[in-house]
């Protein structure tokens, strides 16, 4: 690994992940042939990037280093990350900056709505950093953003990917009352890997969060996802499926974990496309309305197309 040292600037640059700086490098196996992405060089990519920057917005596509950014931005699809670019947690898999976030921007909901209009989005995905520093975890800001998009882009369907609102009483009720079309909260990994991968979260709290969404509003689609390749066993993935179905979750995503830097959790193995296919078939057999399972699957990848399929699957059940 090459380390670049700034010998010109007098202002010290804060590490993106200060809590990981002292860790030894974690080496991952070489990527197999099926892990391939297109370089982001198209005209559509450039136009999307311009709209994002003009509105002063943050995207999880950039901050998390999503491998699908070239494909999605070429189609003018972007996932907006609200409440800043700095997270209060330090998950071992995540490339988003860690630290003390700044104050919320009260104009951000309007900026998201305006960017949605300019991009012509039929389906919008909104996510956020964890904001454990806020009394409501950012729930009111989520709700305000949903309402702003509804007002300015009434035909756009809205999917949210939320933090867990751990120890934030009443926060979930505020978000659900804003009536997103899809409520996504990712489990990220199997329970046995939480201490090493997602130490600030609680597995069964996340399951209960998803279950509670259905109790508050059964019309909202619920969605969750996990990464594989973090050291989990197959039977553990199947148990996660059962736990999610017990919470009546509609949509499951499963994708390959890719290491952002050598300071992050190592890739323990690359799951083969055939194994992903097997997970997909099993998940459908367990009753999920929609499943996306492949090496390059990510929560927001093809979200608009998947939402159309999700609605069609629910409609077919009610006939």
Curated annotation (Swiss-Prot):
PROSITE patterns: RADICAL_SAM. It is an enzyme of class 2 (transferase). It catalyses: [[Fe-S] cluster scaffold protein carrying a second [4Fe-4S](2+) cluster] + N(6)-octanoyl-L-lysyl-[protein] + 2 oxidized [2Fe-2S]-[ferredoxin] + 2 S-adenosyl-L-methionine + 4 H(+) = [[Fe-S] cluster scaffold protein] + N(6)-[(R)-dihydrolipoyl]-L-lysyl-[protein] + 4 Fe(3+) + 2 hydrogen sulfide + 2 5'-deoxyadenosine + 2 L-methionine + 2 reduced [2Fe-2S]-[ferredoxin]. Residues 73-289 form the Radical SAM core domain. [4Fe-4S] cluster 1 binds at residues 61, 66, 72, 300. Its cofactor is [4Fe-4S] cluster. GO terms for molecular function: 4 iron, 4 sulfur cluster binding; lipoate synthase activity; metal ion binding. GO terms for cellular component: cytoplasm. Residues 1-32 are annotated as: Disordered. Residues 16-32 have a biased composition (Basic and acidic residues). SUPFAM superfamilies: Radical SAM enzymes. Belongs to the radical SAM superfamily. Lipoyl synthase family. This is Lipoyl synthase.
